[in-house]
Amino acid sequence: MHSYQLLGLAAVGSLVSAAPAPSRVSEFAKKASTCTFTSASEASESISSCSDVVLSSIEVPAGETLDLSDAADGSTITFEGTTSFGYKEWKGPLIRFGGKDLTVTMADGAVIDGDGSRWWDSKGTNGGKTKPKFMYIHDVEDSTFKGINIKNTPVQAISVQATNVHLNDFTIDNSDGDDNGGHNTDGFDISESTGVYISGATVKNQDDCIAINSGESISFTGGTCSGGHGLSIGSVGGRDDNTVKNVTISDSTVSNSANGVRIKTIYKETGDVSEITYSNIQLSGITDYGIVIEQDYENGSPTGTPSTGIPITDVTVDGVTGTLEDDATQVYILCGDGSCSDWTWSGVDLSGGKTSDKCENVPSGASC
């Protein structure tokens, strides 16, 4: 064999030996797609390149958002340890999600702690300190959030504007705000969404457990709500989207709250509320209304004068039972002339409190 042939074979051999084995290439790729972040800026800047994200005890600087809206489609995001936030008066949000096919979860013992007492002043969003919204699940599609543990939000906890999302086994605990000025600490605020499925949530707060302002194909089941304003649809009206359709709220408890079941629409606005079901709702310690449906809200408060621009139709109330405080009203219905229809009620059994003599235009199938 000629010497140049020997040199050629040697060169080929060196190239072969230098190439990593396929298993090593795969391992390198796997490592590159798994990212652990310990700062908000790192996470926001690099999350798009990771398929498996761990957020480890992140301290988010004051006035900044833990921005996860560039998450890669199909990625998994896991919170570890305590996620905390610096103090500043601003509108937030403190956390923002975005993306498709996401799985968001938490490691054992993890918590997202808003330390809301720094902002609480009994005024919520109605004045006083400017308080940041907590979590935006916006522009999210076909995703699952599970086991999310949230504590002490400054004001509203979770804003949802999404398509086909499952929110499973959330804990939102703002009970420290009961005696420390927590206000407007809604659990779930849903708008402009299609397909939001909430199951197994525990919400302790000082406002609506859930409030559906617009959207369709929404369910809330197996929930435990206490301390707040109950299970609400609305206020509906005065927004870009003013339709609420195909909502089921079922198999849930509401305790030590202002209201049990509530639907409210805005006076002289237009829109539509239809295909609403409340089923198997157990109430206790209700202070204001067991069931309240009214078409008279203006500037955040009832006026006593209903309007007809937002019909409330095809409402099923089945198995709303429980106890009210002495000063509470069992059922209050205030509809415009002909703007509430096709209601079906059964198994409504409320004790305590009093009946109302101020109901108006109660549709057949319901009683006040």
Swiss-Prot record:
Keywords noted in UniProt: Cell wall biogenesis/degradation, Cleavage on pair of basic residues, Disulfide bond, Glycoprotein, Glycosidase, Hydrolase, Repeat, Secreted, Signal, Zymogen
Keyword Cell wall biogenesis/degradation: yes
Active-site annotation: 207, 229
The reaction(s) this protein catalyses: (1,4-alpha-D-galacturonosyl)n+m + H2O = (1,4-alpha-D-galacturonosyl)n + (1,4-alpha-D-galacturonosyl)m
Placement of PbH1 repeats on the sequence: 140-161, 162-192, 193-214, 244-265, 273-295, 307-352
EC number of this enzyme: 3.2.1.15
Removed propeptide positions: 19-31
Known glycosylation sites: 44, 46, 246
Disulfide-linked positions: 35-50, 209-225, 335-340, 359-368
SMART domains linked to this entry: PbH1
One example of a Gene Ontology biological process annotation: cell wall organization
Superkingdom field: Eukaryota
Location of this chain's protein in the cell: Secreted
PROSITE patterns on file: POLYGALACTURONASE
GO cellular component, one term: extracellular region
Chain's role: Involved in maceration and soft-rotting of plant tissue. Hydrolyzes the 1,4-alpha glycosidic bonds of de-esterified pectate in the smooth region of the plant cell wall.
Name of the protein in its database record: Endopolygalacturonase I
Native organism: Aspergillus niger
Gene, per the UniProt record: pgaI
